[in-house]
From Swiss-Prot:
Keywords: Glycosidase, Hydrolase, Periplasm, Signal
Residues reported to bind substrate: 152, 159-160, 196, 205-207, 277-279, 310, 511
Sequence similarity: Belongs to the glycosyl hydrolase 37 family.
Name of the gene this protein is made from: treA
Enzyme Commission no: 3.2.1.28
Species annotation: Escherichia coli (strain SMS-3-5 / SECEC)
Signal peptide positions on this chain: 1-30
Name of this protein: Periplasmic trehalase
Name of the top EC class for this enzyme: hydrolase
One record GO biological process: trehalose catabolic process
């Protein structure tokens, strides 16, 4: 494949089509060479629906993770025969025919552990191995051990894992980093993409695409050999995200790809199914029923696609932040996703060059440059002075500021003057006493105020540092770390999310109770500890006063959350 010559710029437009046609076969090949495991709602049909609607378990994920003790077809036949008999007990039937997931063991850390010691001690506790699984298990086998988030999350999750891996690398566990990269490469080769998590019911969607960044992280330890080794899988994942682009007309969308009227190619989140999520079955049905003016399948797809975004759920996806049934994830072009796609294209260019394919490297660079222009044109709100999502229905950029706006800075896709404006907007609207707010809207959803999440703290910190905005970056890290430390001092655990309106409180909202563990919080905490403390004086706990600053940080007053975006 030849790269275009500088003297013939009109050929540049052909490059994306050439790449997409060449790699379209990669995802198809992966799909054709594997038998896709069926999720429990399909395997068990009416039995699954009846069990979930009966609310036998406080958490709908419990039965989704239950393992049939025999062929599901035989269990279903027995159910149909017995269900109308006198004295039939559904709970007893489930207990006889299924092995329920074990409750997570409560980890009690040794007395007197520092924050760093606690995290280092958790890595083996959170490590799982499932080289083989039961035939009808919803859990998908993986060849190498992996680290799970913790709590109800008994499987590996895609985007969580990148931030967990940052911590593993910080702890010197490069073998575990390599194992997890190998697992994700295995999933790409087996299923054509990395699913939301290694469960059959997650196969219809992916999550924020961090695989290329995982390979780049591994390359810090193994050099270009890692980039060359995993180039085929990175190409396959890119083909998955761009699937359908070759036949797309201006103004159309296909699965995860969007082609705007001027030909700009961007991406959105998408789930291939439009049914209730097995792990949140009753909740999804209730959400769809609460808005009879919309087709239920449309709401289900948007709920699933929000889960694919990792932000399940947020006012970011909703017309009315107080009504989940107004979410329309698939008609929104996310700024964070397209920043990650830009980074994927840049890493593919680097890996192609490392493999000696300069022509392909040039083509990926061209794609990255085109996407960067698209981000600057469509995902910047000039009136507000921040990056934001693009609305496919109104054909304009949205007004809401969210922590996702820091992603262009994280991947070095932002213009310098805009990065400066983002620093101001972040400090003015999102920074709180306990860290960075996810949004400034209080909706009751977990990806809204007053919750702060570890991955978004790190993206903001790194992104602002990339553009010389070190004071704001340090403010975010310092306030979040203080929150983590205060919570740990009181409860001896790290949690999934934090209330950033104060310090020392776990977050709330969402579909399930607060989870501890917690993979990505552990990883980001280690990275931040090593960021704020000098290398010659590493710290095991958060210092009482902020290091690396001419003065200690002044306490932040809590900002009032806005009622609407």
């Amino acid at each position: 494949m030849k790269s275009p010559t500088p003297s013939r710029p009109q050929k540049m437009a052909l490059i994306p089509a050439c790449i997409f046609l060449c790699f379209a076969a990669l995802s198809v090949q992966a799909e054709e060479t594997s038998v896709t495991p069926q999720p429990p709602d399909i395997l068990l049909g009416p039995l699954f629906n009846d069990v979930q609607n009966a609310k036998l378990f406080p958490d709908q994920k419990t039965f989704a993770d239950a393992v049939p003790n025999s062929d599901p077809l035989m269990i279903l036949a027995d159910y149909r025969m017995q269900q109308n008999q006198s004295g039939f007990d559904l709970r007893h039937f489930v207990n006889v025919n299924f092995t329920l997931p074990k409750e997570g063991e409560k980890y009690v850390p040794p007395e007197g552990q520092s924050l760093r010691e606690h995290i280092d001690g958790l890595w083996p506790v959170l490590t799982r191995a499932t080289e083989n699984t039961e035939k009808w298990d919803s859990l998908l086998p993986l060849p190498e051990p992996y680290v799970v988030p913790g709590g109800r999350f008994r499987e590996v999750y895609y985007w969580d894992s990148y931030f967990t891996m940052l911590g593993l690398a910080e702890s010197g566990h490069w073998d575990k980093v390599a194992d997890m990269v190998a697992n994700f490469a295995h999933e790409i080769d087996t299923y054509g993409h990395i699913p939301n998590g290694n469960r059959s019911y997650y196969l219809s969607r992916s999550q924020p695409p961090f695989f290329a960044l995982m390979v780049e992280l591994l390359a810090q330890h193994e050099g270009d050999a890692a980039l060359k080794q995993y180039l085929p899988q990175m190409q396959k994942e890119y083909a998955y995200w761009m699937d359908g682009v070759e036949n797309l007309q201006a103004g159309q969308q296909e699965k995860r790809v969007v082609k705007l009227q001027d030909g700009t190619l961007l991406n959105r989140y998408w789930d291939d199914r439009d049914t209730p999520r097995p792990e949140s079955w009753v909740e999804d049905i209730a959400t769809a029923k609460s808005n009879p003016n919309r087709p239920a399948t449309e709401i289900y797809r948007d709920l699933r696609s929000a889960a694919a975004s990792g932000w399940d759920f947020s006012s970011r996806w909703m017309d009315n932040p107080q009504q989940l049934n107004t979410l329309r994830t698939t008609s929104i072009v996310p700024v964070d996703l397209n920043s990650l796609m830009f980074k994927m294209e840049k890493i593919l260019a680097r890996a192609s060059k490392a493999a000696g394919d300069n022509a392909m490297a040039n083509q990926y660079e061209t794609l990255a440059n085109a996407r960067q222009k698209g981000i600057e044109k469509y995902l910047w709100n000039d009136q507000q002075g921040w990056y934001a999502d693009y609305d496919l229905k109104s054909h304009k950029v949205r007004n809401q500021l969210t922590a996702a706006a820091l992603f262009p800075l994280y991947v070095n896709a932002a213009a310098k003057d805009r990065a400066s404006k983002m620093a101001t907007a972040t400090k003015t609207h999102l920074l709180q006493p306990g860290g960075l707010n996810t949004t400034s809207v209080k909706s009751g959803q977990q990806w809204d105020a007053p919750n702060g999440w570890a991955p978004l703290q790190w993206v903001a910190t790194e992104g602002l540092q990339n553009y010389g905005q070190k004071e704001v970056a340090m403010d975010i890290s310092w306030h979040f770390l203080t929150n983590v430390q205060n919570t740990y001092d009181r409860e001896k655990k790290l949690v999934e999310k934090y209330d950033v309106s104060a310090t020392g409180t776990g977050g709330g909202g969402g579909e399930y109770p607060l989870q501890d563990g917690f993979g990505w919080t552990n990883g980001v905490t280690l990275k931040m500890l090593d960021l704020i403390c000098p290398k010659e004086q590493p710290c095991d706990n958060v210092p009482a006063t902020r290091p690396l600053s001419e003065s200690t940080t002044q306490p932040l007053k809590q900002k009032e959350a806005e009622p609407t975006p």
